[in-house]
Curated annotation (Swiss-Prot):
This is Periplasmic nitrate reductase. HAMAP family: Nitrate_reduct_NapA (MF_01630). Component of the periplasmic nitrate reductase NapAB complex composed of NapA and NapB. [4Fe-4S] cluster binds at residues 46, 49, 53, 81. Keywords: 4Fe-4S, Electron transport, Iron, Iron-sulfur, Metal-binding, Molybdenum, Nitrate assimilation, Oxidoreductase, Periplasm, Signal, Transport. GO terms for biological process: cellular respiration; Mo-molybdopterin cofactor biosynthetic process; nitrate assimilation. Disulfide bonds: none annotated. Its cofactor is [4Fe-4S] cluster; Mo-bis(molybdopterin guanine dinucleotide). InterPro entries: Asp_de-COase-like_dom_sf (IPR009010), CT_Nitrate-R-NapA-like (IPR041957), MoPterin_dinucl-bd_dom (IPR006657), Mopterin_OxRdtase (IPR006656), Mopterin_OxRdtase_4Fe-4S_dom (IPR006963), MopterinOxRdtase_cofactor_BS (IPR027467), Periplasm_NO3_reductase_lsu (IPR010051), Prok_molybdopt-oxidoreductase (IPR050123). It is found in: Periplasm. It comes from Escherichia coli O1:K1 / APEC. The lineage of its organism: Bacteria, Pseudomonadati, Pseudomonadota, Gammaproteobacteria, Enterobacterales. It comes from the Bacteria. Belongs to the prokaryotic molybdopterin-containing oxidoreductase family. NasA/NapA/NarB subfamily.
Amino acid sequence: MKLSRRSFMKANAVAAAAAAAGLSVPGVARAVVGQQEAIKWDKAPCRFCGTGCGVLVGTQQGRVVACQGDPDAPVNRGLNCIKGYFLPKIMYGKDRLTQPLLRMKNGKYDKEGEFTPITWDQAFDVMEDKFKTALKEKGPESIGMFGSGQWTIWEGYAASKLFKAGFRSNNIDPNARHCMASAVVGFMRTFGMDEPMGCYDDIEQADAFVLWGSNMAEMHPILWSRITNRRLSNQNVTVAVLSTYQHRSFELADNGIIFTPQSDLVILNYIANYIIQNNAINQDFFSKHVNLRKGATDIGYGLRPTHPLEKAAKNPGSDASEPMSFEDYKAFVAEYTLEKTAEMTGVPKDQLEQLAQLYADPNKKVISYWTMGFNQHTRGVWANNLVYNLHLLTGKISQPGCGPFSLTGQPSACGTAREVGTFAHRLPADMVVTNEKHRDICEKKWNIPSGTIPAKIGLHAVAQDRALKDGKLNVYWTMCTNNMQAGPNINEERMPGWRDPRNFIIVSDPYPTVSALAADLILPTAMWVEKEGAYGNAERRTQFWRQQVQAPGEAKSDLWQLVQFSRRFKTEEVWPEELLAKKPELRGKTLYEVLYATPEVSKFPVSELAEDQLNDESRELGFYLQKGLFEEYAWFGRGHGHDLAPFDDYHKARGLRWPVVNGKETQWRYSEGNDPYVKAGEGYKFYGKPDGKAVIFALPFEPAAEAPDEEYDLWLSTGRVLEHWHTGSMTRRVPELHRAFPEAVLFIHPLDAKARDLRRGDKVKVVSRRGEVISIVETRGRNRPPQGLVYMPFFDAAQLVNKLTLDATDPLSKETDFKKCAVKLEKV
């Protein structure tokens, strides 16, 4: 029986009305309702951003056929954004990859060959050969992996174990390096522990919201709906929005501030000065819970050492700091006067004062939100530190309705990249590879020889590009990310390395992305509810979901790929004799046996799954792999302020916010009565630091790595739009989302367009020192840049805006500044 949408809706209405009235139901309505009831519903977190909305997934006949907001989910309370409502369609693009593809010519691998279907065994044969050759000839530093904040928790954990323990290479980094690394380093420097102290429940209790470089209306729309409700329901609530261009979040703003790029550092120091000058310091909090330090300056821009800017820097890459007195700090910020700040930022004085008054008013609860405007910044760590200063000076932290809150852009940038520790320098639960004690903890838990994990920090994302280009990194596996489109400086620093004959590139992805098409081997990957998974969102909420359908064709999850590939290596092939001598019982064993099929991981039987429950990996291996990996991983954080609940609890709950102690989640960390790690009488305790005190840093304004000049006379900022997510590899395959925003445009001020003889709809060539792209002029619409700046989203594979961007990074976090480079326009 086929029905139109109208007939379907009408039949549902008839059935509902008849049931309410106690009447008999027409046959067609009964049939439709029966068909609807045949849909099986189960919970899952949304596949997109870091908000962590809960959805109900409807499956029927082996396919995801529907999706709705989960009314029991505390994050979104039944509401989805436009992307969330179309989640089912991301899985069924016409070009979905279903079998491995290898570049071949004359029946064998060839770097210049055509993509040819092969089997998984053939794919692993080629990978095994390339990995073993590189390891034998050049050692562990010649191989690398680029992962994702979209990995599930156990996928990231399995990948980290394989590289850091198995292959003894720390050259593994996630794409969260491009979005959250500055937040991580900022948290660690100020508090000694990563991730926000507050939660989304703050929204309903706050008096003021300040957005620093965050367009929440489009990038975190569900949270924005809660802020909007709070603002419109309470006339005394204030919203301030700071950005380098006007966007949709300004529609709600009481104080909408456009500032000159990079000058947010000036504004932050001005507010600190205002707080001090107006005696608005919370003296009791400040005296008990805060230390003051002066940070190193002139630290460079994370460019190659041969770059003139790096050569000129006095302290390139330095995160050093020294204690300072309050009087010295007061004198430091005193330089950032209202007059100087207005001049440097271009912001009117009255707007600056209004903003400062929000923080200084002891009766106003303030939340600071930020995302990429802060983090993708050559002084992103400093920006994070400076906003913490404002909350630490006023004591507006770790209490309901108050606090600094770093929002995340990916569904598990927190839960996987940060908490699991898939960065090149990290291990689980905030541990790091450079700390011998931390390495020892991991090696003992993993039952591997002491000294297995290298002490040297591996290559971060941008350094991986450079090493590939230089021929130092020769085998490179990327998963769950599209870095050829998303990463900076494609022309100069990425594409050359990927297409270098010395290098072999593997891309695991569900679709033929820009990255996949630039690779040598493509592995088809299972998506979202085609596997069992777990994500951790921005408020420390860990959420689980079960596999609900099977992947098409031969597509396999990232977890399956990692675990099965580990079977190809024996310990003698990857570890030196001195390590094997410490644990001779591991001789002859495969990395699969050493890392995954261990007594610790394999102790949970498949029988724990319901008889009809899908779980392809566990049923193939004969034990509950996901549970074993999670419980082993969770051990690292329990008792250390990162406590995760038992595995089974998450399948019953709509997520739990860590630390979870004695079955109770934590909404606000570091404060007495809210955090189980803060004892009675302590008030506040920032227990990531040895003395329990947070740090206020004195850090100055320093200019951007590249700014407009006479030839390249415009700032370029890049970012996202509501309808698409990151590089659009999923959302552009949803017809409705594609139609809503079919191609990227160049947002430009009308006067800048007029001065260049450009009109709305014209084609325009955007040119930087590194490359050029053709786009379309947009002088109206949702984004309205000031004169001197243009904005372009990066979702469009036909307009690779990252051909233009500079690979300058924050020297401390190694995160790229995608918000500031110089371009010129040429009419086409």
